[in-house]
Amino acid sequence: MAEKTEKPTAKKLRDAAKKGQTFKARDIVALIVIATGALAAPALVDLTRIAAEFVRIASTGAQPNPGAYAFAWAKLFLRIAAPFVLLCAAAGALPSLVQSRFTLAVESIRFDLTALDPVKGMKRLFSWRSAKDAVKALLYVGVFALTVRVFAGLYHADVFGLFRARPALLGHMWIVLTVRLVLLFLLCALPVLILDAAVEYFLYHRELKMDKHEVKQEYKESEGNHEIKSKRREIHQELLSEEIKANVEQSDFIVANPTHIAIGVYVNPDIVPIPFVSVRETNARALAVIRHAEACGVPVVRNVALARSIYRNSPRRYSFVSHDDIDGVMRVLIWLGEVEAANRGGPPPETRAPTSAEPQARDGVAPPGDACADNAFPDDAPPGAAAPNAGSPDGGAPARTGDQNA
């Protein structure tokens, strides 16, 4: 059998919690309940009300009805004891729920005959937890003896003074001394409680330790094969809806960044002369948009500055291109129209001197950042030569033969 050396996983801890196997420092819960009761007793337990009831009965001298008399005492007892009991119950329930992380142990409620197995009972009798409880019991005996010794040294005068106290003060004095004794015992037992909680936490994780095979098997059951899951997740992320695919096919061009952003631009002068954003995707979906555009013959222009600017200034799909980006978009549309005119064998596009805001190309290669950076013609290109694909640096057939709206 493999040695269990691995720490329990989060799933292992959750499954154990459903079975009722959670970290439980019962003595800490008892400490909180006792401390709450000791501090609340002087305020909630009013013995003067009981004494006043006796005085009332004695002063009247009448024979009370036994039924009414018992009912009155029961009602008085509930009025005094109910708040005290409810407060102690809440003080005990809240720490228990916190320790179990508010997990309902459904499986532990079911009747289990294996709990009556004598072999398992003998194992529990001679387990590390049983040895821990035995040592803890001996330590508590020593703590109680120390508490009595310290209490006698501090409050012996008050204890012997009870014989000379007035009867009306006896109840109050007994409550005060009892509270002091309880709090002193809890203070002396605090080191034992901390040590018990630490050992209990160690034993709890020791019982839930796993071997390496269990860890691997649990990972396969919960996550599946890592390569298959990664591939499936990648394919799922790259799938485009039919609406986005249709928008890509109807776009005049796609401007990319070049792998993280894909912006589709559509212009229809019959509707409105201002171009608007038809596609707006990022990361894996942007890559899918680029691939689909190349497959459908839609030009893909890789322009980092323009793509980032449109993405920043047009926060959603189906919004108009901002005023700051219209110039760059129109330059791309004009260039695409010139490329398609050259591909149809028409006259070569007119050569014009670039403006100061438009960088010149050197040796037929467009400067970085230009919308046509990947599609420049060499100076000696013959008229009517086929232009490279707007989205492919290695050239080839034109991406689309339809007219571009400039």
Curated annotation (Swiss-Prot):
Region: Disordered, residue numbers:
341-406
Q: Which GO terms describe its biological process?
A: protein secretion
UniProt xrefs under InterPro entries? BsaZ-like, T3SS_substrate_exporter, T3SS_substrate_exporter_C
Q: Which GO terms describe its cellular component?
A: plasma membrane
Coiled coil spans: none
Bias category Low complexity: which stretches?
Answer: 370-399
List, alphabetically, the Pfam families matched: Bac_export_2 (PF01312)
Under the heading SUPFAM superfamilies, the entry gives:
EscU C-terminal domain-like
Localization recorded for this chain is:
Cell membrane
In what way does this protein cross or attach to the membrane? Multi-pass membrane protein
Transmembrane segments in this chain: where?
A: 28-48, 80-100, 137-157, 175-195
Q: Any idea which UniProt keywords this protein has?
A: Cell membrane, Membrane, Transmembrane, Transmembrane helix, Virulence
Q: What does this protein do?
A: Part of the bsa type III secretion system, is involved in the intracellular replication of invading bacteria inside the host cell. Probably necessary for the lysis of the vacuole membrane and escape into the host cell cytoplasm.
Question: Could you tell me which PANTHER family the record lists for this protein?
Answer: FLAGELLAR BIOSYNTHETIC PROTEIN FLHB, SURFACE PRESENTATION OF ANTIGENS PROTEIN SPAS
**Family to which this protein belongs:** Belongs to the type III secretion exporter family.
Name of the featured protein: Secretion apparatus protein BsaZ
* Organism (species): Burkholderia pseudomallei (strain 668)
Q: Which gene encodes it?
A: bsaZ
